[in-house]
Regions:
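Alpha-helical transmembrane segments
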Residues: 49-58
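Short acidic, Gly/Ser-rich segments with clustered Asp/Glu that frequently serve as metal-coordination loops
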Residues: 1-2
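Weak global preference for isoleucine
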Residues: 13, 57, 118-122
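Small/polar glycine-rich anion-binding or flexible loop at a beta-alpha turn
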Residues: 57-67
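Active-site activation/catalytic loop segments of kinase-like enzymes and analogous catalytic loops
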Residues: 6-50, 66-85
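ATP/Mg2+ or Mg2+-diphosphate-binding catalytic cores
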Residues: 70-124
Length: 124
């Protein structure tokens, strides 16, 4: 099944540009590391940029927030359903993961303009 570049980019940022592990419960420390975002975006666009259309390029920053929110919802849903999908190490593990992802989404919302500017500076 073919994938979507926005999903791949967004999930990579969700995991790779988070200042904390996805199950760190110190939510005040969770933030998007813009230098990691920029480095990944440069590499991604240098290799895949020619295969992307303008709409995809315009939505790269948003895709990071979308995939982070989606993963947070999946962790929360799994927690509410009795932890049947994701492997957990302790009873509230998926709840901690969800809160971590939602903290990252909140930081991405604060930094969205900067994220979009980074993409724009790379593609111009």
């Amino acid at each position: 099944m073919p994938g979507l570049a926005l999903y791949d980019f967004g999930d990579s940022i969700r995991f790779g540009a988070n200042s904390c592990a996805e199950d760190d419960d110190n939510y005040d420390k969770v933030e998007l590391m813009l230098d990691y975002f920029e480095a990944y975006a440069k590499g991604f666009l240098s290799e895949a940029g020619d295969a992307l259309n303008q709409c995809e390029i315009d939505n790269l920053a948003f895709s990071a927030k979308l995939m982070t929110f989606e993963c947070g919802m999946r962790f929360l849903t799994d927690y509410l359903n009795g932890d049947t999908y994701f492997k957990t190490a302790y009873p509230e593990h998926n709840l901690v993961r969800a809160k971590n992802q939602f903290a990252l989404v909140a930081d991405m919302e604060r930094k969205m303009e900067q994220m979009q500017q980074i993409i724009k500076s790379i593609t111009e």
